[in-house]
């Protein structure tokens, strides 16, 4: 019998948990790839780091309500919960993705810091 994978219900998705999950660069990279490519097998992210580290990052994203993991035979498929996130926090995922892409294009790979007036 397959182990059931727990996901928070839409109403249980917490803004602080989502922001904390997306504050880590590896998890942001996973989300950016899912935005670009759609659902993927967890093993498709092997170049992002060791399997134990990736398992931890996948769990943090799932527990925060950012992703959904489903079993397909021996594989785990991961996808973004775009509809749930948009319903709870309209525009949040799009803003985070846009900021992450802008950061990737800036010198040093970090988001530009605006000078205070």
Residue ranges and their predicted role:
Residues 65:
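Glycine-centered, phosphate/nucleic-acid-interacting loop/turn motifs that mediate DNA/RNA or nucleotide
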Residues 58-59:
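Short, hydrophobic-biased segments on the C-terminal half of alpha helices
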Residues 68-69:
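Short beta-strand "wing" residues that participate in macromolecule-binding interfaces
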Residues 14-53, 72-84:
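N-terminal helix-turn-helix DNA-binding core of bacterial DNA-binding proteins
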Residues 2-14, 36, 81-117:
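Amphipathic alpha-helical dimerization/coiled-coil segments
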């Amino acid at each position: 019998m397959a182990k059931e994978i727990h996901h928070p219900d839409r109403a249980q998705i917490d803004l602080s948990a989502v922001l904390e999950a997306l504050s880590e660069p590896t998890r942001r990279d996973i989300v950016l790839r899912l935005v670009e490519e759609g659902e993927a097998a967890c093993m498709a992210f092997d170049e992002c780091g060791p399997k134990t580290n990736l398992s931890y990052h996948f769990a943090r994203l799932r527990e925060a309500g950012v992703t959904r993991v489903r079993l397909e035979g021996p594989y785990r498929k991961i996808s973004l919960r775009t509809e749930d996130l948009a319903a709870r926090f309209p525009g949040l995922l799009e803003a985070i993705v846009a900021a992450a892409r802008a950061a990737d294009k800036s010198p040093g790979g970090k988001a530009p810091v605006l000078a205070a007036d």
